[in-house]
């Protein structure tokens, strides 16, 4: 049981580290202004650390415009992560739009009208 808890803790720590590094990268190194309005909401790495789902939301831009940009930049993100995070293999990143923040804002807007 202890080994499983340690493995789970390690995965959570890596998730947070990847989220933090990608957020920093978006704020400091990405020149495309459309990607600067993006927020990384969560990262879920697989147990074998080979792939990671990166959940994001956007403030101003249309998500359909952002998805191809993220797919194109995923190699750049992986290279950066390989230099900053000490892992045997850098995970393959898959970006997934997170609609939860938008849904929450819509619910708040509807409740304020009551």
Curated annotation (Swiss-Prot):
Native organism: Vesicomyosocius okutanii subsp. Calyptogena okutanii (strain HA)
One term of GO molecular function: ribosomal small subunit binding
Complexes and interactors: Monomer. Binds 30S ribosomal subunits, but not 50S ribosomal subunits or 70S ribosomes.
Entry keyword set: Cytoplasm, Ribosome biogenesis
GO biological process, one term: maturation of SSU-rRNA
Protein name as catalogued: Ribosome-binding factor A
PANTHER family in UniProt: RIBOSOME-BINDING FACTOR A, CHLOROPLASTIC-RELATED (PTHR33515:SF1)
Gene3D superfamilies: 3.30.300.20
């Amino acid at each position: 049981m202890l080994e499983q808890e340690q493995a789970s803790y390690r995965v959570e720590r890596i998730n947070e580290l990847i989220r933090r590094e990608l957020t920093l990268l978006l704020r400091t190194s990405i020149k495309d202004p459309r990607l600067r309005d993006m927020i990384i909401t969560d990262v879920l790495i697989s147990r074998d650390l080979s792939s990671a789902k990166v959940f994001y939301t956007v403030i101003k831009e249309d998500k359909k415009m952002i998805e191809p940009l993220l797919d194109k930049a995923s190699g750049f993100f992986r290279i950066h992560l390989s230099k900053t995070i000490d892992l045997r293999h850098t995970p393959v990143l898959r970006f997934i739009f997170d609609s939860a923040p938008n849904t929450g804002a819509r619910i708040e807007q509807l409740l304020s009208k009551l």
